[in-house]
Amino acid sequence: MKVLLIDDVLATGGTIGAAIELMHRLGAEVVHVLALLEIDGLQGRALLSAKYPDIPISSLVVS
């Protein structure tokens, strides 16, 4: 199963990272992450990109 993971806020990356791990344990493939708002100063995107380099991340608004 392929999954588009959508979250309201990308800050530190903790919630999205946990969701990706859960999807992997359930046998799903996360094909993209979409955040409605990204808080750039907290470096969540950098953390997620380093840990999951094959999963693209998009944000509608970056603050």
PLM feature segments, named:
Residues 17-63:
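PRPP-dependent phosphoribosyltransferase catalytic core
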